[in-house]
């Protein structure tokens, strides 16, 4: 599909070098084909024609991220946000880019600001919590996941995050409880196998008959 669309958009550009829709469509096609360098090259030509559209700069940033160059992505994601401060996805991607260049403090600042100004934007909670887990800060990660499920009790990934955080904190009863909550919501997901196996491991290791601890369901 996208290979065919590349030819269509190239023909459109040949007929009109100022046709922004054709450049954008070509760039998006290249992106889905994972030809990120071609996508970036096309988008850079596009912003020379029209530098007022935040989506164009956003896509450049995303392509740089996908191509393994978060340091280059930052500049274009910032430009997208300056054009449109309501572009929440650009802010998320900017936070990811900062994390990837070892600027965790800036990444956390962006997530915190997003949560403060857009409390219903659940992706900010999840990404922040996942980042905190990656940093080994499991207590703060669990707190952030709890904020998320307070907003949306059906956000199943948050229950898995809480379970894994408690697991790392050696709060095994709580870990089992939240693994089970996750399984109630998503018993057939890819992570369900891990969750079931981990519950069984924890029960056998810490809550067996030989152990003085008991598990309360």
What residue ranges belong to the model's regions?
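Helix-start (N-cap) detector for alpha-helical repeat units in TPR-like alpha-solenoids
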Residues: 20-21, 54-55, 88-89, 122-123, ...
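Short solvent-exposed coil/turn linkers within tandem alpha-helical repeat scaffolds
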Residues: 16, 118-121, 155, 185-192
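Structural signature of tandem alpha-helical TPR/SEL1-like repeats
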Residues: 1-11, 32-45, 52-55, 66-79, ...
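Short acidic/polar micro-motifs centered on Gly/Asp/Asn
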Residues: 13, 95-99, 163-167
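Canonical tetratricopeptide repeat
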Residues: 25, 32, 59, 93, ...
